[in-house]
Amino acid sequence: MSEAAQLRRGLKPKGKTYGLTNQKRREIREIFDLFDIDGSGSIDASELNVAMRSLGFEMNNQQINELMAEVDKNQSGAIDFDEFVHMMTTKFGERDSIDELSKAFKIIDHDNNGKISPRDIKMIAKELGENFTDNDIEEMIEEADRDKDGEVNLEEFMKMMKRTSYG
């Protein structure tokens, strides 16, 4: 059984726990899977760039590369789940204020209609030089879309992003 399947079933996760409850670790896994666009089980520099911008952090390529070097302890060229957990709990846990999350939401909500649509994600991906498939975008929306209307409103976005606030 894959770790993702174990987490969905509520079994004890493998790897370092950083003092997190199983529930919080599952929530971080959900965010990790959202940003692991290619499903490789790790986040490369390109995916990290998308993740940081989505979280409201405007970072240039040099800053992304520096963050990768700092977080990628095994120097694999990508951030695995344990490294992501460490980054989220030690580096960015305290950064998820309501103002910062609202700013991130507004950046992604290109048409300013109060919802993040597949079109909004396509537009920000284009700005970032990313090329997501429609399936990738659909999966991103489904991760946060609690009312199942096909878009992510501010409340849904806040709930999803606040689940990564452990600092």
Swiss-Prot record:
Molecular function GO labels: calcium ion binding
Cellular component GO terms, alphabetical: cytoplasm; nucleus
Primary residence: cytoplasm
Organism superkingdom: Eukaryota
The keyword Repeat belongs to this UniProt entry's keyword annotation: yes
The keyword Signal is annotated on this UniProt entry: no
Binding-site list for Ca(2+) 2: D72, N74, S76, E83
Record: residues binding Ca(2+) 3: D109, D111, N113, K115, D120
Subcellular location: Cytoplasm; Nucleus
PROSITE patterns found in the cross-reference section: EF_HAND_1, EF_HAND_2
Induction description: Up-regulated by UV-C induced DNA damage, but not by DNA double-strand breaks caused by bleomycin.
Tissue: Expressed in leaves, roots, and at lower level in stems. Barely detectable in flower buds and flowers.
All copies of domain EF-hand, residue ranges: 23-58, 59-94, 96-131, 132-167
Key words of the record: Calcium, Cytoplasm, DNA damage, DNA repair, Metal-binding, Nucleus, Repeat
InterPro entries xref list: CALM/Myosin/TropC-like (IPR050230), EF-hand-dom_pair (IPR011992), EF_Hand_1_Ca_BS (IPR018247), EF_hand_dom (IPR002048)
GO aspect biological process, one term: DNA repair
Binding site for Ca(2+) 4: D145, D147, D149, E151, E156
Sites where the protein binds Ca(2+) 1: D36, D38, S40, S42, E47
Description of its domains: The C-terminal EF-hand is necessary for the binding to RAD4 and for efficient nucleotide excision repair (NER).
Function text: Potential calcium sensor that binds calcium in vitro. Modulates homologous recombination and nucleotide excision repair (NER). Involved in the early response to UV irradiation.
Family listed: Belongs to the centrin family.
Assembly information from the UniProt record: Interacts with RAD4. Calcium is required for this interaction. Interacts with SAC3B.
Name of protein: Calcium-binding protein CML19
